[in-house]
Amino acid sequence: MAEQASFIDRLSARFAGAKVIVVEPRGEVTLEVPAAEWHATALALRDEFGFEQAVDLCGVDYLGYGSDEWDTADVSSQGFSRGVEGKAQGRFAWGEFPTEENGADGARPQHMPTQRFAVVAQLRSYQHNLMMHLRCFAPDEALPVVSSLTGIWPGLNWFEREAFDLYGVIFEGHPDLRRILTDYGFVGHPFRKDFPLIGNVEVRYDEEKKRVIYEPVTSVEPRVGVPRVIRDDARLQTAEGERAQEAVK
């Protein structure tokens, strides 16, 4: 613990303008920096702190973060139906945003995250036996761009391609930034929260044309089987506390 505390102090001193986040009880350390300092910070972590390996890199879409689809703390005849009707972005079709109430054709919610897209790199130092996360948010939601880290850790080449393919994050300076998982001509980025769960097109083999063709989705019903919930929701904790008090009486 003393070694980790020293490491956190050194991070805070070296990157004075950054945010150091420690998640308890596991003690996971995340250094959050502005996108403009993303590349320089990564280089310093490799050369000055001994993080010689980048284990992973991924994109994150924080659209709708902190919002759920479950309206009740207790089991009811209406709670689940409200959940499965789909209140979150992208549950039904492209570009549809729900209201605070039920329905998928309402207005865009008023409370949107100030920064939507983030990139997170997981770093490892073998010489110091340390692991940490480096995170930055893309400043422009419409066109998320951050610097490529392939010049520092070449092994991130395909990880950045994956984040580009699934989230649409552009890595400036990447030597070969093209899709890696989706098909040729794929429209959109499927891990974005506003991408429809049923997709935009479906694939089938056309017997007459003797080839695979794409058609608009028709065979999948847009239904949410598992509503989105928040772990340790305050409403749930309050309900449990009230039940515990009633049991004591």
UniProtKB/Swiss-Prot annotation:
Reaction(s) this enzyme catalyzes, per UniProt: a quinone + NADH + 5 H(+)(in) = a quinol + NAD(+) + 4 H(+)(out)
Known EC number: 7.1.1.-
Localisation: Cell membrane
Gene3D superfamilies named among the record's database cross-references: NADH:ubiquinone oxidoreductase, 30kDa subunit
InterPro entries reported for this sequence: NADH_DH_suC, NADH_quin_OxRdtase_su_C/D-like, NADH_UbQ_OxRdtase_30kDa_su, NADH_UbQ_OxRdtase_CS
Membrane protein topology class: Peripheral membrane protein
Enzyme class: translocase
Keywords annotated in UniProt: Cell membrane, Membrane, NAD, Quinone, Translocase, Transport, Ubiquinone
Gene Ontology cellular component list: plasma membrane
Pfam families attached to this UniProt entry: Complex1_30kDa
PROSITE patterns (alphabetical): COMPLEX1_30K
Function: NDH-1 shuttles electrons from NADH, via FMN and iron-sulfur (Fe-S) centers, to quinones in the respiratory chain. The immediate electron acceptor for the enzyme in this species is believed to be ubiquinone. Couples the redox reaction to proton translocation (for every two electrons transferred, four hydrogen ions are translocated across the cytoplasmic membrane), and thus conserves the redox energy in a proton gradient.
Entry's family note: Belongs to the complex I 30 kDa subunit family.
Quaternary organization: NDH-1 is composed of 14 different subunits. Subunits NuoB, C, D, E, F, and G constitute the peripheral sector of the complex.
Descriptive protein name: NADH-quinone oxidoreductase subunit C
Provenance organism: Stenotrophomonas maltophilia (strain K279a)
